[in-house]
Every structure is written in C-alpha cells, then in structure tokens.
Amino acid sequence: MNRRELGQKWEELAEQYLRKKGYKILTRNYQIRGGEIDIVAQDGEFLVFIEVRFRSDISFGTPSETVNEKKKASLKKAIKVYIHENFLYHLQPRVDFIGIEQKDNRFFVNHYQNVLDF
C-alpha cells in the first residue's frame, strides 16, 4: 500500500470509531489550497474537525507529537473556509485528534477532544 492508501485505511478506522460513539460523519478529506481536514463530523451542537495520525513505532514520537505548528495553521485555515462554504455558523467548532498506534498486531485508538483553540 502506498502512503495515501494507508492514510485512508486509518481514516476509515477512525470513522468507524466515531460512528460507534454517535458522531455523524459529514465529510472526509476536505481540501483547500494549503490545508486539509481528515474528517468533519457533528457531535450534538459541535461541528468537529478531526485530524487522524498513525504510528507503528512511537520511538520517533506518538501520533499527537506529529502535529506541528504549520499543520495547526493550515488546519485552522481549512476550518474557516469549510464553515463559510457550508454556512455552519450555528454549530460550535471543535478540533479533535485521533491517534492510532499499532502494538504487535493490535490497534489502539486514542481520541482527544478540543485540542486546538479556535
């Protein structure tokens, strides 16, 4: 599998997790020039923008440690455009992070809510 296919695999796993938690998935892989949102979902009155990361070897950092300031800035830009394009001003924006780690042949999903001030 190439890098993009692997990314889709982890996003599908994250989407399954979110659906089980009651989230309504609105969009996947929303892209603008200079930014991308992996998953957009609704959780009650919240419009949730989710960044998904995977690590099979955490010796180089956990999934959450891979989100740098440049990624945060591009994510904020994409969020503003998404809200404007879809007229979703009535929902409270929230940024969540899903980190997927592989240990042996098992996968662990870590979900962190409200990780980025908006």
Swiss-Prot record:
InterPro entries: Restrct_endonuc-II-like, tRNA_endonuc-like_dom_sf, UPF0102_YraN-like. It holds the Pfam family UPF0102. GO terms for molecular function: nucleic acid binding. Belongs to the UPF0102 family. NCBIfam families: PRK12497.1-3 (NF009150). This is UPF0102 protein CHY_1414.
